Amino acid sequence: MKKWMLAICLMFINGICEAADCFDLAGRDYKIDPDLLRAISWKESRYRVNAIGINPVTGYGSGLMQVDSQHFNELARYGIKPEHLTTDPCMNIYTGAYYLAIAFKKWGVSWEAVGAYNAGFRKTERQNQRRLAYASEVYRIYTWIKSSKGIRVPTTKKSLSQINSVQKN
């Protein structure tokens, strides 16, 4: 179902994105806090649309959300080419949100799942440490984004869903 949603969203994305913030749109469509998507994008690319990052294990990451080249075969089934990810910011943000939603579905809405966006799902101590380090940095960026908007984020080790519910009250 989510794969069909991704395909449909991506077909209409170009026209929509000219008038709205793609982080907000992708967040709405995937039920992910747009500021979390912004934090991940800052961590991954410093908001550089055409960023290319080398990944010694799987190849390279592309664009704002550093979508990994290991996903290119799957994305090709939806008509998404690697060059789209570095030239179409909205497509890149939606694609990153799609893969984050997969992590949330697999591990729940948690910081561990945020870490898996970057470090994968392998259950080894090394990957656990990589997930923790990545999620900690994203959390720091996320709290900075929220504080710049006057929103206080709890400093306890709450899950993302608990933090999001606090912010909506």
From Swiss-Prot:
Alphabetized UniProt keyword annotations: Plasmid
Source domain of life: Bacteria
Pfam families: SLT
Matches recorded under CDD domains: LT_IagB-like (cd13400)
Family that this chain belongs to: Belongs to the IagB/IpgF/P19 family.
UniProt protein name: X polypeptide
